[in-house]
């Protein structure tokens, strides 16, 4: 599968999930470990703009940032995790994220290192 097909598939899945969820806002996942969780700052705003323009969602243009161990992650149907390098989850962080995913949350992970 080419990178372009994977990217388009990711957009389609993301838009599908957003369209059928009652809450439409997305959040950026903040994590420990020095993996640059804040990198690629235009990716999620561009996705939000695309979805708002093309499938009539009404998401806030600027996504919120939530920490992986926070109960606030349950307020968002989709979390976006980006960066490269080390990612560290404490046992509590991992349990919180696991509970989020088991409860139906969706985690989109973008390793933006740029190598093929």
What function would you assign to each model-found segment?
Residues 10-18:
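Bacterial N-terminal signal peptides
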